[in-house]
C-alpha cells in the first residue's frame, strides 16, 4: 500500500505544471493556431474599410430620422383630423341654432350660440398654429436633407476611387447622381392644408 502511494506521488511530481494565464501556456496554445487566425485581432468584420463603416452608420442614422419624421407626420395628421371633426360638430350645432328665428330663440339658445362661435374660433386658431408648425418642420427637414446629401456625396467620393478599377473609371466619364435617400411623403402636410378646404370640411 505504501509502495502505491509513493509511486503515485512520484508520477504527479513529474507532470509539467500548467498555469493558466502564464506565458508558457499562452505560447503553447498559439503554436497550434494558423497564421490567419493569429492575424485577426478584432471581432469586427475585417472586410469593411473604416470609411465604409462610417458611411453605413450614416445611412442607419438617416433611416432613424426618416422613421421619426414619419411618426411626427402621423401625429400631425391625427391632431388635424380630430380638430376638423370637433369643428364640424360644433358648426352643425351652430347651424341648427341659426336656423331658429331670432324672435323664437330662448336666452339659453342665444348664449349657446355665442359659446359655439367662440369655441369654433379657438379651434380654428389652434388648427392654424398646427399648420404653421407643420410648415416650419417641413423647412427644417429640407435643410437636413440637403446637409445629409452633401455629407454622403463627400463620403462616397473616396470610396468610388477605391472600388472602381482604372478601366471602369475611364469608361464611366459621366458623373453619377448622389445616392437616393429615403423620402417621406407629404401626405400629412397636404392633409393639414386641405382638410378644411372647399372640398373637405368647409369650416372656413
From Swiss-Prot:
Transmembrane segments: none annotated. Residues 3-150 form the bMERB domain. GO terms for cellular component: microtubule cytoskeleton. It comes from Homo sapiens. GO terms for biological process: cell motility involved in cerebral cortex radial glia guided migration; microtubule depolymerization; negative regulation of cell motility involved in cerebral cortex radial glia guided migration; negative regulation of microtubule depolymerization. InterPro entries: bMERB_dom (IPR022735), C16orf45-like (IPR040127). Residues 162-187 are annotated as: Disordered. This is bMERB domain-containing protein 1. PANTHER family: BMERB DOMAIN-CONTAINING PROTEIN 1, BMERB DOMAIN-CONTAINING PROTEIN 1-RELATED.
Amino acid at each position: 500500500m505504501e509502495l502505491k502511494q509513493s509511486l503515485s506521488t512520484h508520477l504527479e511530481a513529474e507532470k509539467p505544471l500548467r498555469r493558466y494565464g502564464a506565458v508558457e501556456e499562452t505560447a503553447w496554445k498559439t503554436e497550434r493556431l494558423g497564421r490567419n487566425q493569429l492575424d485577426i485581432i478584432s471581432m469586427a468584420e475585417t472586410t469593411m474599410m473604416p470609411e465604409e463603416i462610417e458611411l453605413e452608420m450614416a445611412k442607419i442614422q438617416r433611416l432613424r430620422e426618416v422613421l421619426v419624421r414619419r411618426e411626427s407626420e402621423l401625429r400631425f395628421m391625427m391632431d388635424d383630423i380630430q380638430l376638423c371633426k370637433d369643428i364640424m360638430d360644433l358648426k352643425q350645432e351652430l347651424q341648427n341654432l341659426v336656423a331658429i328665428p331670432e324672435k323664437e330663440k330662448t336666452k339659453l339658445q342665444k348664449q349657446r350660440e355665442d359659446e359655439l362661435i367662440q369655441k369654433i374660433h379657438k379651434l380654428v386658431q389652434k388648427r392654424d398654429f398646427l399648420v404653421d408648425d407643420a410648415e416650419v418642420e417641413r423647412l427644417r427637414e429640407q435643410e437636413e436633407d440637403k446637409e445629409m446629401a452633401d455629407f454622403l456625396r463627400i463620403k462616397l467620393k473616396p470610396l468610388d476611387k477605391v472600388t472602381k478599377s482604372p478601366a471602369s473609371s475611364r469608361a464611366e466619364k459621366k458623373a453619377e447622381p448622389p445616392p437616393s435617400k429615403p423620402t417621406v411623403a407629404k401626405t400629412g402636410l397636404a392633409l393639414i392644408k386641405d382638410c378644411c378646404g372647399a372640398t373637405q370640411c368647409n369650416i372656413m
